[in-house]
Amino acid sequence: MKKLGLILIIIALFAFSPEKIKTKGIALIEYNAKFNESNAYSDIKRVKDVKVISLWIDDDASLKSDEGIRSVPTMILYKNGKEVKRWEAGLSMSLDVPYIEIQKEVDKLTGANKF
């Protein structure tokens, strides 16, 4: 029984590890906290050609330290598991970046709009 408990703990520890979050290809991850849910980035659904993931740092405290999250929301664009670009909230605790700026960064990575 102790072995089963230990196995479940190990699985839980690795279930949300940053290596699992970072997928192959291009991913846009919004890190936020439940106390700041009202300031979630509403335009995230408008960004195209990217896998979009929203995560609560309250659910996995290691996300904050592993990803260097200093304020919420924070949006990080990854390519093949490597951080490419980061947008962080200011004192207002909201992300004031036009979605088109994020889309342009995604387009650079996907090669969209190239002739």
Each model region followed by its residue ranges:
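Non-catalytic, surface beta->alpha helical segment in thiol-disulfide oxidoreductase systems
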Residues: L77-F115
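Local sequence-structure signature of Cys/Sec-based thiol-disulfide redox active-site neighborhoods
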Residues: P18-I53
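N-terminal post-signal-peptidase region of extra-cytosolic proteins
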Residues: I57-S65
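Active-site-proximal beta-strand/loop segments in catalytic clefts of secreted hydrolases
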Residues: Y31-A33, I57-D58, G90
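Structural micro-motif
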Residues: E67-K79
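N-terminal hydrophobic targeting signals that begin at the initiator methionine
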Residues: M1-K2
